[in-house]
Amino acid sequence: MALWNIVPSWFEIEDRITHNIGYQGGHARIQFNEYEASLGLTIRRVHNVRTAFARAEWIATGSLRQRFANLDICSILTELISVINQMAMIVAGSVLAGGVIGAGVGAFGGGAGAIPIGMAGAAMGLQVSSWILGVLGLVSIAEFFVEGLPRIGGYYLDGINIAWRGSQGDEGLDPYGRDEPFAVDRASQHIAQGHEEVVILLLGAIVAYLTRGRGNAQVLAREMQASAKGARLGQWMLK
């Protein structure tokens, strides 16, 4: 399978969750006497995560424009953030629908749930790094990029977790369940921070490859030119 075909859509994530959870009404109880999440509640939670991801793109783009104003990064930023957002979708699919990490409905199961801390590194592992380096034509910089990626997974998983838990309970069923009004905003900040850290890691890895790794900028630019999404970044690098 081509690397760019592993990025799930939100429709695919919802479809897999629907398939795995079924249409239970949320009447069963799980541990701590909580109600098992209904399909409707679970889909609301997915929509929270989706909204947080959409907002995070805008937040990260604005922040990076200010941070790297002296590098004239605007010409590559929109496409680069789009690629990074797709990479983060692999993480979201892994966590929410079990796409990469395992079967079932991901880390949350049927209940309220929370993401295990140890999942951060797994979610940002080899498949994720291979995908983004492949689509940008940056496989050559892998040794300077891969080790720094797992720690960034925590930003994405925190954001997903906050957005997910922003909806609690089904109306009329759980008297203690209510939506947290600022959860999506807080979640988007975490996800945006993840996007920013990936950009910084990528740019730093390119510099390290060309200096410590004694890589050739012209050769790297040609590799990026031949990739699905790296041509513009390669041209910018040569300026």
At which residue positions do the language-model features occur?
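Generic structural motif recognizing short loop/turn segments at the entrances and edges of beta-strands
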Residues: 9, 26, 203, 232-234
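Short, Lys/Arg-enriched charge-dense amphipathic segments
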Residues: 99-106, 194, 235-238
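Hydrophobic, membrane-inserting alpha-helical segments
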Residues: 132-135, 139, 181-227
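Long, low-complexity intrinsically disordered regions
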Residues: 226-239
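Charge-rich, low-complexity amphipathic helices
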Residues: 99, 106, 110, 167, ...
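Cationic, glycine-rich low-complexity segments
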Residues: 1-159, 216-219
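Short membrane-interface loop/juxtamembrane segments of multi-pass integral membrane proteins
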Residues: 163-189
